[in-house]
Amino acid sequence: IPADYITYPVSVGDPVFERLFRAEGPFDIVAHFAAHKHVRSEKDRYSIEAMLENNVLSTARLLDLLLESPPEHFFCVSTDKAANPVNVMGASKKLMEEAVLAYAAELPATTARFANVAFSNGSLPAGFLERLAKHQPLSAPSDVLRYFVSPEESGQLCLLACITGEPGDIFFPRLEQPQMLTFSSIADALLERLGYEPVRCASEDEARELAASLGPEDARWPVYYFESDTSGEKG
């Protein structure tokens, strides 16, 4: 790690962040990644208020602060759910994009819309790995299709937006229809990659019973797939 790589345990919304910015700036690039990215963060009014505070209001305050000493480039991460949003999370990120674009005349700002980042923290595929570590059956919707990018691809997208983007640009991965995957197909592929044979069960209880009966050397792994209207996935 380079000697000039410094981290601080500070939230972008903390008053100490403003003091840090004024004391240590100006900066070449400011990349803003703080966000609520889960649809399931809409579970109650307090969660929604926290989401709007983090995704919209704190971003607007950060933009006001940056006007004091504008960086050469400002980047803010968004989500594919900001396109024609159908939930509060997507709408909050759309509002964030509008706020960023409103400052484009004074700040060279870009953003990037992600698809789901495969196996990122809090995602359903990451939950598969946690269940495997606990010797638990995998459970997933079989009728939900999603686009995915790898963590490496998501990082490359951010770098491209930071380095090559023009003010007001919104970057997004160009993915085709055949690249959409179901969570059940991801679970099957993961198990097969690890040397296991997925065994489909008719219920979650049946899957748990089978998991409890399998020995450590058994190559079978119980799975339960179901139809669902939403996955609560992160974008």
Name each model feature, range by range.
Residues 127-149, 153-156, 161-183, 225:
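A conserved pocket-lining segment of Rossmann-fold NAD(P)-dependent short-chain dehydrogenase/reductase
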Residues 44-73:
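NAD(P)-cofactor binding segment of oxidoreductase domains
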Residues 164-235:
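Mid/C-terminal beta-alpha module of Rossmann-like enzyme folds, strongest
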Residues 30-36, 74-79, 112-114:
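SDR active-site strand-loop-helix element
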Residues 12-53:
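NAD(P)H-binding glycine-rich loop region in Rossmannoid oxidoreductase-like domains
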Residues 2-15:
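Rossmann-fold cofactor-recognition segment
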Residues 61-71, 85-112, 120-134:
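Active-site Tyr-X1-5-Lys
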Residues 7, 51, 74, 109-112:
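Hydrophobic/aromatic anchor residues within beta-strands of the central parallel beta-sheet
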